[in-house]
Amino acid sequence: MTLWINGDWITGQGERRRKTNPVSEEILWQGNDADAAQVAEACQAARAAFPRWARQPFAARQAIVEKFSVLLEAHKADLTEVIARETGKPRWEAATEVTAMINKIAISIKAYHARTGEQKSELVDGAATLRHRPHGVLAVFGPYNFPGHLPNGHIVPALLAGNTLIFKPSELTPWTGETVIKLWERAGLPAGVLNLVQGGRETGQALSSLDDLDGLLFTGSASTGYQLHRQLSGQPEKILALEMGGNNPLIIEDATNMDAAVHLTLQSAFITAGQRCTCARRLLVKQGAQGDAFLARLVDVAGRLQPGRWDDDPQPFIGGLISAQAAQHVMEAWRQREALGGRTLLAPRKVKEGTSLLTPGIIELTGVADVPDEEVFGPLLNVWRYAHFDEAIRLANNTRFGLSCGLVSTDRAQFEQLLLEARAGIVNWNKPLTGAASTAPFGGVGASGNHRPSAWYAADYCAWPMASLESPELTLPATLSPGLDFSRREAV
């Protein structure tokens, strides 16, 4: 029984699904997808639970969310192993994901009050009050790269605001989704407040097409995000938050501290086997001897990165990709760029055929025409050389995406110029592109999102503002508007 609807664990009536470890092919989870009727049932349960949940005092909702945080801490080792085994990422990195989930609770509570709490301004004849109200029933679509943390970034603020939810994890990480929901169950969520439906494309389409949804919160690919945007077009009454990845540039202007610059590049491009939406996909390196030396050092160090299993000892820097198919897609993207005229600096290599273990690849594309503007979700780094900083900014902005952008330079003025001219929601200076803070908004422009950033700003799309002018008494103004006559006439 792998669906949780209205407080009950039930068996899906849709397609049978099996999840294996992407490296060892060990079977980890088996279950059935939710069919359209069960998706509708989950929505009905969420709708029925909404009035009571929304009327709960905020402190009552907060108490349940904080109990969930306590359970995350108590089961950190178990959840870490589930995430690591299911995604293929190393244990150390899965542990950081669970830590991020725990930290998200306190941050979301602070963000609720800062962004969407209640504010009152005293007026001469009363008060002006700003309150926030939950939307109602929201669908949450989770990704596979951070199957615990990223859905958590929608679920926690949405519950705090008083919404009820239907959560569909990625079909590639059903085990993590189920494990997290079981902790929410133990935290004491009332029946119907949070519902779990497992499944792939058909389940997702059934969920996103429900008439009774009040909104949808999505993290995933641009292609799916655009599809959801088209599907919900003409429905302005529904809130839609899309986080859709990027084709992110990292500019290496000054690599005087060469090993530090190489380390930052590795962290930007290859952490999580290149499966972070903020990962550097395009490396822009200044022409000249220093740039040549930097690239040689990068290729040297990156060539020594050996992906490993989640539980290897010592731990590897990177593990496997989410699937053997994902690894194959990266290989095909590399070969395509070679065919266009790219010069391979470091060839990606499958460690073992049929698994998702893949070594990093680096290819130079300076002067190559018609390079696809796409997010290749894996450890493949494209290199361009540039002559001057204005050209670097032009290259950085030469994408339909706009999630993250970074600069390695000792010149503050160059960073200030980049802040003014970059088209990206995250612009870092001498910090990895993959570094982000939950105390700041997380999101992008262009094809990277629809201006609904998450993290600190997630509270914004989880509630709507209600403005009130209030007075405990009704009084006639001392000064009336022109043309109004309230004098009493004597009866004739």
Swiss-Prot record:
What catalytic activity does the UniProt entry give for this protein? N-succinyl-L-glutamate 5-semialdehyde + NAD(+) + H2O = N-succinyl-L-glutamate + NADH + 2 H(+)
EC? 1.2.1.71
The organism's superkingdom is given as Bacteria
If you read the UniProt record, what top EC class would you report for this enzyme, in one word?
oxidoreductase
Binding residues for NAD(+): G220, S221, A222, S223, T224, G225
Which UniProt keywords are given for this protein, alphabetically ordered? Answer: Arginine metabolism, NAD, Oxidoreductase
Signal peptide boundaries: none
Q: Which PROSITE patterns match?
A: ALDEHYDE_DEHYDR_CYS, ALDEHYDE_DEHYDR_GLU
InterPro entries in the cross-refs: Ald_DH/histidinol_DH, Ald_DH_C, Ald_DH_CS_CYS, Ald_DH_CS_GLU, Ald_DH_N, Aldehyde_DH_dom, SuccinylGlu_semiald_DH_AstD
Q: Does the keyword NAD apply?
A: yes
Could you name the active-site residues? E243, C277
Give the matching Gene3D superfamilies: Aldehyde Dehydrogenase, Chain A, domain 1, Aldehyde Dehydrogenase, Chain A, domain 2
Q: Which GO terms describe its molecular function?
A: succinylglutamate-semialdehyde dehydrogenase activity
The record's annotation in CDD domains points to: ALDH_SGSD_AstD
Q: In which pathway does it act?
A: Amino-acid degradation; L-arginine degradation via AST pathway; L-glutamate and succinate from L-arginine: step 4/5
| Keyword NAD in record | yes
List, in alphabetical order, the GO biological process terms annotated in this UniProt record: arginine catabolic process to glutamate; arginine catabolic process to succinate
Could you tell me what this protein does? Catalyzes the NAD-dependent reduction of succinylglutamate semialdehyde into succinylglutamate.
Q: Which family does it belong to?
A: Belongs to the aldehyde dehydrogenase family. AstD subfamily.
Annotated PANTHER family: ALDEHYDE DEHYDROGENASE-RELATED (PTHR11699)
Q: What is this protein called?
A: N-succinylglutamate 5-semialdehyde dehydrogenase
Give the classification, highest ranks.
Answer: Bacteria, Pseudomonadati, Pseudomonadota, Gammaproteobacteria, Enterobacterales
| Gene this chain is encoded by | astD
